Amino acid sequence: MKRLNKLVLGIIFLFLVISITAGCGIGKEAEVKKSFEKTLSMYPIKNLEDLYDKEGYRDDQFDKNDKGTWIINSEMVIQPNNEDMVAKGMVLYMNRNTKTTNGYYYVDVTKDEDEGKPHDNEKRYPVKMVDNKIIPTKEIKDKNIKKEIENFKFFVQYGNFKDLSKYKDGDISYNPEVPSYSAKYQVTNDDYNVKQLRKRYDIPTNKAPKLLLKGTGNLKGSSVGYKDIEFTFVEKKGENIYFSDSLHLEPSEDK
């Protein structure tokens, strides 16, 4: 009888441990989603100039009269099997104080040279935004680059995360010492955001991607750190295909 009681108590204890662990995991997943929710709920913002009037997270890193500067970055990286890795993207700095925007379009080609040591060759093309149109500030002779800049759209302009709750059973990671956190979800090719990416980019794989929400800083909010979105289609040695996006508010350099 004593042995049976010990066995029952052991099973109950194990059940409690599993329940508590699962509960903590679910709770942390909800926290990670909530930390992204304020920013992602703004997607899509078709007219980028609307960001001049949108508030972001502010703390004591901001001067009281500083409205902050929105920093937007969208990038597509494609490396076919054992070929060069090509990253193309754009960064914009949208100053809410002056309502001016500048940034650059970039093309970064990484080659494996000199005994396997990677060498990158990044070219930047400065741009500005006028009347919601992105315009090069210097002459560009390469017609393909000019067209890529003219047609460029940031993920924030067409992505949609109105219902984060549809992403479930994610692989959650949290390190309170950094602090850093992430949530990874397997999505399908029928996902709205995946369809939008395939519509705009020539993605050389039919594999469905994983969605990664990752960030650093206080989970409850901080102007220090970052929050990134990443759709990873392929990730292995010699072959990488992924899209990354970020939108965050930072203190302005000119107050």
UniProtKB/Swiss-Prot annotation:
Domain of life: Bacteria
Subcellular location: Cell membrane
Entry keyword Signal: yes
Topology of the protein relative to the lipid bilayer: Lipid-anchor
Signal peptide: 1-23
Keywords linked to the UniProt accession: Cell membrane, Lipoprotein, Membrane, Palmitate, Signal
Lipid attachment site numbers (S-diacylglycerol cysteine): 24
S-S bonds: none
Annotated InterPro entries: Csa, Csa_sf
N-palmitoyl cysteine lipid attachment residues: 24
GO cellular component: plasma membrane
Similarity comment: Belongs to the staphylococcal tandem lipoprotein family.
Record's protein name: Uncharacterized lipoprotein SA0092
Taxonomic source organism: Staphylococcus aureus (strain N315)
